[in-house]
Amino acid sequence: TLEMVRPDPAERVRSLQLYGVNPAVMAKAATMLVERDLTDHIDLNFGCPVPKVTKKGGGAALPWKRDLFSDLVGAVVRACNEAGERAGREIPVTVKIRIGIDSEHETATDAALSAQKLGAAALTLHARTQNQHYAGQAHWDEIARLKDLLDIPVFGNGDVFEAADALAMLERTGCDGISVGRGAQGRPWIFRDIVAAYHGGTIPPGPSLAEVVSVIER
């Protein structure tokens, strides 16, 4: 597993995303990654809606268990602070969540405030519920609400498939940044396009078939 996360020497900044349900195991994993110099940043993923994960109480289902959520985030933040101090560098921990289980069981407010209190450096909201999975429309107004609620940076996620979507999210929510998920699958150049659009530049033309094939082969 460690070989799967080993970065290219040229990569900076290196980020790794973890998920789990056991605070002690998660803290140990974070410590190992920092001590072996495999990451500069840990993101805790509480956004996965896949049944095989949520049925075990993980992913998007975990924030419903407030005490466990707090224990897990706190354990990883402490582990990264301690391991980072020994390594002589700062290792920020960020948290990704969803709106809640469904429209009747919202968890984002408590989870976001808890993560901030426990020392999370930033929070990402996938603006859908667990039950929505990836269907329907993302509720960007929830991103704006958390942005107003928190003092730490808030990143938006959901329904960003092209540069225009990213600019629209920034304008409508006031979020501090964009997290791209499915929009990058098969289209890694979306990041180039977003950067160009954000800085007022011209979005480069799409890649040729030969370039796409080259990326797939790599």
Question: Which residues make up each language-model segment?
Answer:
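Glycine-rich, positively charged N-terminal anion/phosphate-binding segment
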Residues: T1-R36, D40
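Non-cysteine beta-strand/loop elements that form the S-adenosyl-L-methionine
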Residues: H41-V50, L118-A127, V180-A184
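Short amphipathic alpha-helices and their capping/turn segments at secondary-structure boundaries
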Residues: V25-I42, A108-K117, E171
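Alpha/beta catalytic cores of nucleotide-metabolism and tRNA/nucleoside-modifying enzymes
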Residues: R78-A79, A83, G88-R89, E104-A122, ...
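Active-site beta-loop-alpha junctions enriched in small/polar residues
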Residues: Y19-V21, G47-P49, K96-D102, R128-Q130, ...
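Active-site glycine- and acidic-residue-rich loops that bind
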Residues: A24-M26, D67, P92-D110
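Hydrophobic faces of well-ordered beta-strands that scaffold small-molecule active sites
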Residues: R14-L18, D40-I42, V93-I97, L125, ...
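Glycine-rich tight-turn/loop motif centered on a GG-T
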Residues: R12, P51-F69, R128-W140, Y198-I203
